[in-house]
Amino acid sequence: MSIKYVATSKLPTPWGVFAMHGFEDTETGKEHVALTFGTLSADEPVLGRIHSECLTGDALFSLRCDCGFQLQTAMQNIAETGCGFILYLRQEGRGIGLLNKIRAYELQDKGANTVEANEQLGFPADMRKYDMIKPMLEQIGVKHVRLMTNNPRKVKAMKEFGIEVVERVPLQVGKNRYNEAYLKTKSTELGHMMSEYHFVDED
C-alpha cells in the first residue's frame, strides 16, 4: 500500500478541537487528511464520514453542491456525539480535478447535468477510488463505522476493505434552488439515497 502516515496536529474548529492526521500517497503524490475527535474505539462503532475534496463547496461556499454543508454538518455531528472521524480525500470533482470541474460547470451552465458534463469531457460519471481508506482507518484505530453518507458506493468500498458499516447515517443537508437539479441527478443517475422530501421546495 502506498499510503504513508506523516504527522498529527491539533485543529481548532468552531465545533471543538479535532486532531488532524496527514497522509501521503507515495505513488500519486496526493495528500489526504483524517480528522478525529475524542477517543476512538476499535471495538465500538464510530461515527464517521468519507469526504472527497470540494474546493468550491468546502472553502468557497458554493451553493452548486451540498458538499460544504455535508462537511460542516458531519463535523458538528461528530463533536456533539463526542467522538468520530472524517477522512478528507483529495479527489476534487469526483476525481477529475479542479480545472476539469470548472469545465464541467461551464457545460452545466449551458444545460448539461453533472453526469452529462463529465461524460462530454470524456470522463466517467465518478472516478473516485477508496483504496486509501483502509490504511488511514488502521492508523486512527477504527474498525466499525456508523457512516454518514447518502452514497452506497462508499458503504460498499468500506465493506470491501474489511471495515464493518454498522449503520448508514443519512446526511441530507444544503438543498437550495441552485443545486436542486444536481441533487436529483445524484439520486436518479448516481444512486445516492435521498428521500423525496429533500427535493421539495422550501417556503
From Swiss-Prot:
Residues noted as binding Zn(2+) in the record, renumbered to the chain: 54, 65, 67
Enzyme Commission number(s) of this protein: 3.5.4.25
Keywords: GTP-binding, Hydrolase, Metal-binding, Nucleotide-binding, Riboflavin biosynthesis, Zinc
Note accompanying the cofactor annotation: Binds 1 zinc ion per subunit.
Binding of GTP, residues: 49-53, 70, 92-94, 114, 149, 154
Biological process terms in GO annotation: riboflavin biosynthetic process
Catalytic activity: GTP + 4 H2O = 2,5-diamino-6-hydroxy-4-(5-phosphoribosylamino)-pyrimidine + formate + 2 phosphate + 3 H(+)
Pfam families: GTP_cyclohydro2 (PF00925)
Any one GO molecular-function label of the UniProt entry: GTP binding
Record-linked InterPro entries: GTP_cyclohydro_II (IPR032677), RibA (IPR000926), RibA-like_sf (IPR036144)
UniProt keyword annotation of RNA-binding present: no
Cofactor(s) listed in the protein's UniProt record: Zn(2+)
UniProt pathway: Cofactor biosynthesis; riboflavin biosynthesis; 5-amino-6-(D-ribitylamino)uracil from GTP: step 1/4
Keyword Hydrolase in record: yes
Active site: residue positions: 126 (proton acceptor), 128 (nucleophile)
Any single GO CC term annotated in Swiss-Prot or TrEMBL for this entry: cytosol
Described function: Catalyzes the conversion of GTP to 2,5-diamino-6-ribosylamino-4(3H)-pyrimidinone 5'-phosphate (DARP), formate and pyrophosphate.
Family, similarity comment: Belongs to the GTP cyclohydrolase II family.
Protein name per its UniProtKB record: GTP cyclohydrolase-2
Organism: Shewanella sp. (strain W3-18-1)
